[in-house]
Every structure is written in structure tokens, then in C-alpha cells.
Amino acid sequence: AAVRLHVLIRGPGVLTMRDASAVVRELRTQRGWTQQDLATRARLSRSFVADVESGKPTVESAKLFDLFQALGYEVVLRDLATGQVLR
């Protein structure tokens, strides 16, 4: 079964899927891309991009990471206690 992403950890707080959806939408629109443009670059379906942007809480994490990579970002894990990034 695919791992489902419910939250992403960021700094001292939590980035929810609603927050992630807003980030994806903002980065996409800043680039002047349609949902289809982003989907093509990430090799995903337009409906998946729409699900992410609508805040659907059960999107597959690997595919969400692919969207961020297509937007020029990487997702990293950081220890909240030490600030150390896991590589």
C-alpha cells in the first residue's frame, strides 16, 4: 500500500496538506503554469495536481515530492530538536 502523507514537518511547526496545497498553487502560478503544465513537468496527471491544490489529505507523498521537484524545490526532513537535516 502507498504511504499517504497527512502532514509535512517544517521548522518548529507543522505544514498541513492545506498549507502544502497553497504553496504548490502559489509556486505554479508564479511561474505562469497551468495545472497541466505542472503535471506534465512532474509526469503526473492534471487531476493529481488538482487534488493537491484542493488540499486532499490522502495524496501519495512520493507524487507530492515530484511536484515540488518539478517546481524546483526539494523536500527534506529536519530534526525539530536539533535542526539537523537528514540526508
What are these regions (language model features)?
Residues 4-8, 76-87:
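Short, charged recognition helix plus adjacent turn
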Residues 6-30:
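A short, Lys/Arg-rich alpha-helix, primarily the initiator
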Residues 22-41, 66:
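Short basic helix-loop element that most often maps to the first helix and adjoining turn
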Residues 43-57:
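Recognition helix of helix-turn-helix/homeodomain-like DNA-binding domains
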Residues 60-78:
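DNA major-groove recognition helix of helix-turn-helix/homeodomain DNA-binding modules
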